[in-house]
Amino acid sequence: MTSFDQVTSLSAALLQCLCNAVSGHPGAPGHCAYRVGTEPVHDINLDGIDLCCEGLAYVMLGDTYPSSDSFPDNDIVRQGDNPCVPPGWAINYRVGIVRCASDPGDDTSQAAAFTQGLYDMLSLNETWCCFRDYVRSTPQFLGMSLVLERQVPGSTSGGCTERYFRMAVQIPNVDCCPN
């Protein structure tokens, strides 16, 4: 097993948790998928699909760095000659939901968007709980840590709005120390 296998397993579980969570609430996004980069692309794609207004629930892989004793902070690896340093990696994710922004001049539209935002908040909370349970029940991740950052609304731009959270997941270093 390598870090590729571990992160593939974590990512699949996280996406499944997210897709299950959003599908259980009104206004489920039309798309639930991985995204790459630093910001999810959610405007009209080349096929003319408006991912923003159809709704997009996403999981993005972020930074990866050595982190064990100071998790979730980056370790300073001073023992580079030790074959098993670092003992762990931090894997960062961003998990979110993108939607059409409501009409700022229409109170009814704003109230509906506010209610949908509450469902999105609940979906992201449920995603976190599901993923935490997955990590806790998977033997290869026993003793590893999770750090959940705050859930935040993104800026409203291009007619879209977003809610997301970031988290760091610790995995054992099986790349430098396979045994």
Annotate the PLM regions.
Residues 54-58, 93, 165:
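A broad, low-specificity signal marking well-ordered, structured residues that form hydrophobic/aromatic
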Residues 39-41, 100, 151-155:
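Short, internal active-site loops enriched in acidic
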Residues 1-82:
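Small/polar-rich, solvent-exposed N-terminal microdomains that initiate assembly or binding
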Residues 1-9, 15, 84-90, 96-132:
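Extracellular/virion structural assembly segments
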Residues 36, 54, 61, 116, ...:
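Feature targets compositionally biased, intrinsically disordered low-complexity regions
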Residues 1-32, 86-90, 134-179:
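Short, charged interaction patches at domain edges and termini
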Residues 59-66, 128-140:
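A generic short-segment signal for beta-strand/edge and adjacent turn/coil regions
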